[in-house]
Amino acid sequence: MGKIMNGYILPHPPIIVPGIGHGRERDANATIEAVKKAAKEIGKDKPTTIILSTPHAPCFRDYVYIMDSGTLAGDFAAFGSPNLKFSFTNNKDLAASIAEKAKLAGVSAGGLAESQKRQYGISDRVDHGALVPLCFIEKELEEFRLVLISTPFLPFRELYGFGKCIQEAVRESDE
């Protein structure tokens, strides 16, 4: 039986990532310390999977997009650091379970077919909204899988219902 250990809402300004700020990170020192503290707590909990919702992933008015590629990768090229790259293993089983539970609850959720991704110009690249916290977490937690979810424009009740689907899927898993 799996369990959700904690939840965090983290800021994600790229300037807090070492090598990107070029001195500007001093202006965000309190943010850096807060993100480091959260990352240390996550590292102590040792979750096998991190479920992360990012406001910069492709989002829809009526659909929760759950990235479904086997490997979730991204970099900071848009912020002048193309060699700062990250790659994570997607927990596809948990992602699929979340999507299935959501559908049963009447919330449209899941991945997208390659043709849909092309149609909408969607890339499976992990965006900075996820990468910034993950680059701090990765320093504290060596091994984990990832479920990456967009932040959709759904009414509050549907979002709450979707959260309950995440909870149910995790409980039924070994995560």
Give residue ranges: language-model regions.
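Glycine-rich phosphate- or other oxyanion-binding loops that anchor nucleotides, phosphorylated ligands
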Residues: 114-174
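A generic structural signal for short, non-catalytic loop/turn and secondary-structure boundary residues
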Residues: 1-3, 141-142
